[in-house]
Curated annotation (Swiss-Prot):
Gene Ontology molecular function terms on file: mRNA binding; structural constituent of ribosome
UniProt keyword annotations, A-Z: Ribonucleoprotein, Ribosomal protein
Lineage: Bacteria, Pseudomonadati, Pseudomonadota, Gammaproteobacteria, Enterobacterales
Database matches in InterPro entries: Ribosomal_bL12, Ribosomal_bL12_C, Ribosomal_bL12_C/ClpS-like, Ribosomal_bL12_oligo, Ribosomal_bL12_oligo_N_sf
Taxonomic source organism: Citrobacter koseri (strain ATCC BAA-895 / CDC 4225-83 / SGSC4696)
Keyword Ribonucleoprotein included in the entry's annotation: yes
A single GO cellular-component term on record: cytosolic large ribosomal subunit
Protein name according to UniProt: Large ribosomal subunit protein bL12
Function noted in UniProt: Forms part of the ribosomal stalk which helps the ribosome interact with GTP-bound translation factors. Is thus essential for accurate translation.
Amino acid sequence: MSITKDQIIEAVSAMSVMDVVELISAMEEKFGVSAAAAVAVAAGPVEAAEEKTEFDVILKAAGANKVAVIKAVRGATGLGLKEAKDLVESAPAALKEGVSKDDAEALKKSLEEAGAEVEVK
């Protein structure tokens, strides 16, 4: 006759704490496992993914209207004409890093209106 799961639970619940510790130790030896490892594996994926709060705005390409894109880059970054032109011509390049989502989306919109291809990461 086989012992049921309920019978095992009843037997364990009637045991003292020391008896349960000895039972666990004996089971670890018998089956070659560790109860601590099982707990660590089960507790591993508890961390929730944090929502990203800082974004990078990347200029992928200047597009057909390079002059308008250079003006938009100057206005957004405060760079001089030569620096903005060099940045636009070296696309793909990071325009701004670590900005808020709203600022990144606003910058992306203004650059796309000027004709640039922009990515927010």
